[in-house]
Amino acid sequence: FFAVKATPNPFLINILRDYGCGCDCSSLTELMLSNAMGVKGEDIMFSSNDTPAHEFEYAAKIGATINLDDITHIDFLEKTIGYLPKTLSCRYNPGGYFSISNNIMDNPGDAKYGFTTEQMFEGYKILKAKGVENFGIHSFLASNTVTNDYYPTLARELFELAVKLK
């Protein structure tokens, strides 16, 4: 997925869409732009925090995969759109420090977003009980990384969590 907020350029979105890349949107404007550019349904990921109800409504209307930022968003989303989609994702924040080798990349523990490890287990239990069938995990643990070492380290952490959640 391409983070639309990085470069909300219709021409770039068009090229990336043609190569099969979806859009990661963090606002109503980005959702509308991606949808207008022909990116549809599950090819749009909606990841936002402090989300107004009308943005959840629009994301659901266009079939975007909604990535919940907080455990309280489960009830808020259900009340807002009247149901929970069959596919939902949750943003994970493991807390502590995120490091590669001896370098501290960032401090997710200080971040304002994401489910804690305990909330991931509770959230997925709630979602499953409410009929959600497909689950995604999203995380963003460091900004402005300058090497590719970040990605396999993050992937390992997410896959280890997925195995535990199963």
Q: Where are the model-predicted features located?
A:
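Active-site-proximal beta-alpha core segment in soluble small-molecule metabolic enzymes
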Residues: F1-K166
